[in-house]
Amino acid sequence: MLRFPTCFPSFRVVGEKQLPQEIIFLVWSPKRDLIALANTAGEVLLHRLASFHRVWSFPPNENTGKEVTCLAWRPDGKLLAFALADTKKIVLCDVEKPESLHSFSVEAPVSCMHWMEVTVESSVLTSFYNAEDESNLLLPKLPTLPKNYSNTSKIFSEENSDEIIKLLGDVRLNILVLGGSSGFIELYAYGMFKIARVTGIAGTCLALCLSSDLKSLSVVTEVSTNGASEVSYFQLETNLLYSFLPEVTRMARKFTHISALLQYINLSLTCMCEAWEEILMQMDSRLTKFVQEKNTTTSVQDEFMHLLLWGKASAELQTLLMNQLTVKGLKKLGQSIESSYSSIQKLVISHLQSGSESLLYHLSELKGMASWKQKYEPLGLDAAGIEEAITAVGSFILKANELLQVIDSSMKNFKAFFRWLYVAMLRMTEDHVLPELNKMTQKDITFVAEFLTEHFNEAPDLYNRKGKYFNVERVGQYLKDEDDDLVSPPNTEGNQWYDFLQNSSHLKESPLLFPYYPRKSLHFVKRRMENIIDQCLQKPADVIGKSMNQAICIPLYRDTRSEDSTRRLFKFPFLWNNKTSNLHYLLFTILEDSLYKMCILRRHTDISQSVSNGLIAIKFGSFTYATTEKVRRSIYSCLDAQFYDDETVTVVLKDTVGREGRDRLLVQLPLSLVYNSEDSAEYQFTGTYSTRLDEQCSAIPTRTMHFEKHWRLLESMKAQYVAGNGFRKVSCVLSSNLRHVRVFEMDIDDEWELDESSDEEEEASNKPVKIKEEVLSESEAENQQAGAAALAPEIVIKVEKLDPELDS
């Protein structure tokens, strides 16, 4: 006899795996069949639905961090954000490959995050979304960074790379909301630039959710006192964001452009430093053995100077030149060092200057926006602060041009030195010297002498002991990340323009001229520029943050469970924003008679509006098998629950009297039957929201649910946590040991059958449930459909008021 499965339709297992490390966080991609995991080893893993196959792994490292606390997907599913507690960093990772596209530091360790997308539509926003970014038309494309340098520059090092487009994402505003300890809450536009810092909330954030209409922010916090935790729900008004949404979107888009350009400039400087160190190390490696083996007390500089003046080299220097360096090696070394010098020069011209010019463009546009005070002054955009930032960028460009002149001068000396040394070595080997190489003017000798003076000073303390016998002081001093003045600043004596400015008090203080810092390094001026830009863009975050006022505070419950036993990252509560009906939902459990009863709190995103059935508790009564009409009655405790989609909640239950291995259930709970309009008046909360909810359990209306469909017994698994994804119609269940994962397809055709008669028979035989796949004949299928049609009208779930007899 053919029988239907335990759950109807069946939740089909599509993947199962035992993982080597404990999983502490998992979240489905909003758009694809991918699930991101974080484990106790500090790894971030990406798995595909099919057979739970691993796509990639982002291992822990010193730069990013090793203690992952939470994950969040960008709404388009192209970027994954994760927070690290040990380094207090947020990393944005590409979904295609385990590479950091962007990272930033925060003030406190992040305990939860939420990434939302704005759904509000308006004609102003639509025109902005559809308009082409003018910067793409007016600004040249940023040159790609050379691949042979730091790995951190991958985002800007691919030809025709779309990483920048991936990083900036769609023009439609999306906001990454971060929550941490001591009331730390910050909002980042496009996941990159801070646009709000919320104050006035106490405790550690357990969950948060910014509504898609930008009208309110829901936060759940925990305040620990005397070994127990007070958990409360807050709702904050965010009317400033809602009222000025077009302006916030434009401003935030500019902020992200500026943030990306600052990262580009930083990476360009990193490449320049590496090229400079390459020159140092190449020359040093050639000179180290010579210095260690020479018997004379003369310095390397003296040895070369003696050769320049008298045309004769000491035995040690001759051995170095002829045996260790060789004529061929000298040519190769010269070409290599010239290439490194050229790389620095190219990075300044192509990368620093183009990046700085783009930065000037976006800051100038931002200044124009700030001048429209009616629109942007309420958001805290300050034209004077932006003007100061523009001036700082101008100073940076001046310093970059100064470095170019120094490089050009050093290149002349360098070429003269290597040409002279090449001729000297040819003479030592008595090879023929070409007449054009033999000519050496007094100017050439001066260049060589300058090169020897500048580069062969023994400087053990320079640059963290890099370049002990050879230094590139004139170029390197610009790349030092220190506050010290330049060792050899440029000579401004005789510079007519400089003298003219110094002698003119009007021009000297003119705001039209960029200030010049002749004694400071490029790194110093760059850091100053970054600080000024950060300060001018920080003001909107302060203004918007202060505008977010606490409108509602509901104390939920007192939690005495230890942090170790409940695994902070999976613990209730769970927040959800229904974008269609503009509602905030909060799932949490209250301990009653040693059982955890699930409660659903809902609030309208608009603080001024109320909603019926604002608080309701759910009791799980009976579960009926489809054809045998066998009813499974027991006492169920809610272990975990998450929203599957706007209409359904996925729940993991524990049968408190069931046998181990058959005591966990996976249930789909439709909200349409929880909030039944016909009897909604009977399920009104009669208590007060000012008193802790767990102290007034009797006042919370309880609806008992009886299931005929949409449930499944989780055999041979101590299921504890669940993550659902209504878009892909899948759910992932995690066991209490945090290693065993089982993935279910939730909406499938009725094609699976169960060969069992009842729970009692299975338990008596002590055999596990066996599921087998069978193909129905056409006649059997017709008979089955006819039988189903003859039954009473199809009711998926029976909903009744609390009836003690049913559960006895």
Curated annotation (Swiss-Prot):
A GO CC annotation given for this chain: nucleoplasm
GO BP term, pick one: anaphase-promoting complex-dependent catabolic process
Modification Phosphotyrosine, positions: 469
PTM-bearing positions, type Phosphoserine: 757-758, 777, 779
InterPro entries in alphabetical order: APC4 (IPR024789), Apc4-like_WD40_dom (IPR024977), APC4_C (IPR056358), APC4_long_dom (IPR024790), APC4_metazoa (IPR017169), WD40/YVTN_repeat-like_dom_sf (IPR015943), WD40_repeat_dom_sf (IPR036322)
Cell compartments where the protein resides: Nucleus
Gene Ontology molecular function terms on file: protein phosphatase binding; ubiquitin-protein transferase activity
Keyword terms, alphabetized: Cell cycle, Cell division, Isopeptide bond, Mitosis, Nucleus, Phosphoprotein, Ubl conjugation, Ubl conjugation pathway
A Pfam family annotated for this UniProt entry: ANAPC4
Pathway annotation from the record: Protein modification; protein ubiquitination
Main location: nucleus
Cited function: Component of the anaphase promoting complex/cyclosome (APC/C), a cell cycle-regulated E3 ubiquitin ligase that controls progression through mitosis and the G1 phase of the cell cycle. The APC/C complex acts by mediating ubiquitination and subsequent degradation of target proteins: it mainly mediates the formation of 'Lys-11'-linked polyubiquitin chains and, to a lower extent, the formation of 'Lys-48'- and 'Lys-63'-linked polyubiquitin chains. The APC/C complex catalyzes assembly of branched 'Lys-11'-/'Lys-48'-linked branched ubiquitin chains on target proteins.
Subunit relationships: The mammalian APC/C is composed at least of 14 distinct subunits ANAPC1, ANAPC2, CDC27/APC3, ANAPC4, ANAPC5, CDC16/APC6, ANAPC7, CDC23/APC8, ANAPC10, ANAPC11, CDC26/APC12, ANAPC13, ANAPC15 and ANAPC16 that assemble into a complex of at least 19 chains with a combined molecular mass of around 1.2 MDa; APC/C interacts with FZR1 and FBXO5. In the context of the APC/C complex, directly interacts with UBE2S. Interacts with FBXO43.
Family to which the UniProt record says this protein belongs: Belongs to the APC4 family.
Protein's name in the database: Anaphase-promoting complex subunit 4
